[in-house]
Amino acid sequence: MLATADMSDGYTNGARLKISTSSKPKFHFIAGLASGLSSAILLQPADLLKTRIQQAHQTSALLFTIRKILASPQPIRGLWRGTLPSALRTGFGSALYFSSLNALRQCIANQGALVPLHGDRDDKRTRTSALPKLSHTANLLTGAMARTAAGFIMMPVTVIKVRYESDYYAYRSIWGAGRDIVRSEGFRGLFSGFGATAIRDAPYAGLYVVFYEQSKKNLNALNFGGLTTARPLSDEPAREDNSEKQLVTSSISVNFVSGALAAGLATSITNPFDVVKTRLQLMPNKYRNMAHAVRLVLREDGVRSLFGGLGLRMGRKAISSALAWTVYEELILKAEKRWPDQDNIEQLTP
């Protein structure tokens, strides 16, 4: 995606630079993979506890669940049960998501739909984000589309992960869980709960990007992190090492806090869909479809059950999203600085 801006303040001949805010697709895939793996491994215990709590009739059993796991012969292993499918799902899911998100945003921007959020025009000499600046509507749509596509591809891993984490099933291995699902439910079983997952993830991802970009705008306006100036682009290195360190620290702080705030807001709005999705994936024979699951959950467990695991999910999402997006953005910016794409900068004459 190319965004052309006047750069006469740095060029006496009045020439303009056409600067691409895009980067190589492999950068986004690798950065997404690294960010997803790190957050999945570190926060697996919280994800496991959330799955256990959202099981039927256990919406207030957090302490009981923790005590039960800690009293087992291998408590540490029990807390990290299901780490492999979770890491595969989150790692490759994040890689696919960030790659798709970047491609969609470039496509929209190339069609002339680039609408900066940070004022009428961004300072093209500097930027803190690996993402282009789009309108709120474009942020919402691209986030939702990218998450839905990645979620569909990774759905079989998600189903296996949820079944393996739950204590409803006595699976001894991940591969055994997959074989049992296919044998008893067919390949369709590997996509149990996709409707609820898509309805949860699409608005979550869309709202997240909107809240994330808006939070960064507000924090920068408040001089959060002690510095309002963004870091230089790779073709304009910092003149002083101290300034560069301040720029890096400031952008990391803004990205991390923005990620946590955005995740908290988006999670609280979409948690009922997460509960329904978990029930569908755990008990497909009991719940025929999403609408049927909602009716049964409300009748048997009440409205409160739709917010089961909200505290855990909100805490986990806030930390994991903040970590994942901060790592992703930093890796992209460092990759662009170390391996600049010469095709991204084109000298133009007026």
Swiss-Prot record:
Domain of life: Eukaryota
Localization, UniProt: Mitochondrion inner membrane
Ranges occupied by Solcar repeats: 23-107, 134-218, 250-334
Keyword Repeat appears in the UniProt entry: yes
GO CC annotations on file: mitochondrial inner membrane
GO biological process: glycine import into mitochondrion
Swiss-Prot/TrEMBL catalytic activity: glycine(in) = glycine(out)
PROSITE patterns: SOLCAR
Record keyword Transmembrane helix present: yes
Record InterPro entries: Hem25/SLC25A38, Mitochondrial_sb/sol_carrier, Mt_carrier_dom_sf
Membrane topology, as annotated: Multi-pass membrane protein
Keywords of the record: Membrane, Mitochondrion, Mitochondrion inner membrane, Repeat, Transmembrane, Transmembrane helix, Transport
Function, as annotated: Mitochondrial glycine transporter that imports glycine into the mitochondrial matrix. Plays an important role in providing glycine for the first enzymatic step in heme biosynthesis, the condensation of glycine with succinyl-CoA to produce 5-aminolevulinate (ALA) in the mitochondrial matrix.
Protein name as it appears in the record: Mitochondrial glycine transporter
Organism: Ajellomyces capsulatus (strain NAm1 / WU24)
